[in-house]
């Protein structure tokens, strides 16, 4: 049922994205392309389909998840990191910690789905690697000279300059996405 809901109501094939907020009849109520949610959903749906184990869902969902990954790669990934979102046609070019984490996993997943040795698979592998390099250099908090880094900054600009006015941890900021990314990378690589 959830896969059908994603495919039939949440995924927008015309815009190659998910819609994120709805009225009670499943009509989208805002024009928002959330790049992080699209790349996160792509790999989570693929994992869910794998667990369900029904070929019909794999056949239905794989084109959708590959379309989501392809679209964010083309419109939001600049070769080293993922922009946050596009709200009514205006792109927020800041880099939010969780979007960067989900980008690594999402592109690794897309590479596997396409075949890691294919041209498209190689494109996604290079993108995941570039994203990880951006994270290591700019998103991980290296203040106080701690070489391995600490928690991740909440937000950096597209050039990697951190916004230090945001807390490192708060109710909406914890190591969930970055911790899960590390576990997924260990499992996939």
Regions found by a protein language model. Give the residues of each.
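Glycan-recognition and catalytic cores of secretory/periplasmic carbohydrate-active enzymes
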Residues: 1-189
